Amino acid sequence: MENVITNNNKGLPKSILKFIPEPIQPLFENPFFSAGFGLIGVGSILAMGRKGFQQAMIQSRRYFFVSVEVPSKDKSFHWLMEWLATKKNKNTRHVSVETTFHQHESGDIVSRINFVPSVGTHYVFYRGRVIKVERSREKNVIDMNSGNLWESITLTTLGTGRQVFQNLIEEAKEMALEKEEGKTLIYTSMGTDWRRFGHPRRKRPISSVILDKGKSELIIQDVKKFLNNSDWYNDRGIPYRRGYLLYGPPGTGKSSFITALAGELQLSICILNLAGKSVSDTSLNQLLATAPQRSIILLEDIDSAIQTGNHDLSAKSNSANAPSISSGGLQYQGYYGNPSVSSGGSALTFSGLLNALDGVAASEGRILFMTTNHLEKLDKVLIRPGRVDLQIEIGLCSSYQMEQMFLKFYPTDFDLAKQFVEKLENYKFSPAQLQAYFMTYSNNSIEAINNLNELIKK
């Protein structure tokens, strides 16, 4: 009996001990040590098995599943969010709320609440396939361009081809563009990125902005010619970009015409504020290079952003006439030298602006419009050909404009329109002044003629 008990308390069998070096065999003959060794061995085997299973799952996912990640910085992220909002899944328990705005033809703006998948994992069906949707958000990472937390959406499905995702994103894009059809999109600069500003606006009819005879047609035809002749520019090695300057007194319709032009040619408008604190030489180049396709880049009131003092371009600058930057924008007082940055001002230099417009790194495929109330304040180097290719004066109303504006409000009163022009032939008014006057007598053309003294006194 004792022999049996002793043999049962032995460690590893001799058939296994013979493979272990003799100096450490006594350790394995100890039953407690051998039991611990066995547990370690079993644990190691289980750990290896688990790791192998994980690797097998990773490999199988690589071979049998296809995924695509869409970061929040990309436009398609917002297309996908709108598309997912249309997928009514009753089983989805965790959603986020997004409010969008829509403008009716009447001009009324209504809000709409969309429920989109919140952060986490969700499933949707698309063309007979199950799509796994993983929305993630980095709590400590902020997109410096938008100021929002960094997000991404990862789509995963069974298969090896990416065509399903291409079709899905294309469908989401078409759905988003359909909502914008017939609208003018406005973008504003944010850091080095463009962000949508407000809601899409109804297109403004080009006929609603009355310029002097022939000027509207001239600009429209010039922009159309540019848009349709990219090959002509490339074949001749000419940079494919076009610059326009509209100058004239306030209230003459410069910005209004650009808005109507964008609607007429189905273009977006990108408003660039040069006096912004975040605008630098580098960010300006980035903004011009990444502007949305088929868009007008608008520099409004360029004279306010760039205040030019009296200086001799042929003279070398010194500390007294070196260009500097004020909190109101870029103040240029000399042609040579580099501007210095004052606290609270823009980090943009005058030379940086010139290089961004037509330097080596200047972007192509670009339509740039500048407006100014004071042409005399602009430096000639800024508006020379190559930077500004067409300058158009948008002045106070001519007789033609007065008559056309009268007929716009009173379409059938041709005789009264001529009387209106004759009575005001010795006076000058801006279109904004005339429009405000006509709106006072919007339904009575006779009163509009009889009360002209009100307009003249103003």
UniProtKB/Swiss-Prot annotation:
Keywords: ATP-binding, Chaperone, Hydrolase, Membrane, Mitochondrion, Mitochondrion inner membrane, Nucleotide-binding, Transmembrane, Transmembrane helix. Residues 48-458 are mitochondrial matrix. It catalyses: ATP + H2O = ADP + phosphate + H(+). It comes from the Eukaryota. Residues 1-26 are mitochondrial intermembrane. It is a single-pass membrane protein. GO terms for biological process: chaperone-mediated protein complex assembly; mitochondrial respiratory chain complex III assembly; protein insertion into mitochondrial inner membrane from matrix. The chain crosses the membrane at residues 27-47. It is found in: Mitochondrion inner membrane. GO terms for cellular component: mitochondrial inner membrane; mitochondrion. Its EC number is 3.6.1.-. It is an enzyme of class 3 (hydrolase). GO terms for molecular function: ATP binding; ATP hydrolysis activity; protein transmembrane transporter activity. ATP binds at residues 248-255. Gene3D superfamilies: P-loop containing nucleotide triphosphate hydrolases (3.40.50.300). Chaperone necessary for the assembly of mitochondrial respiratory chain complex III. Belongs to the AAA ATPase family. BCS1 subfamily. This is Probable mitochondrial chaperone BCS1-B. The gene is bcsl1b.
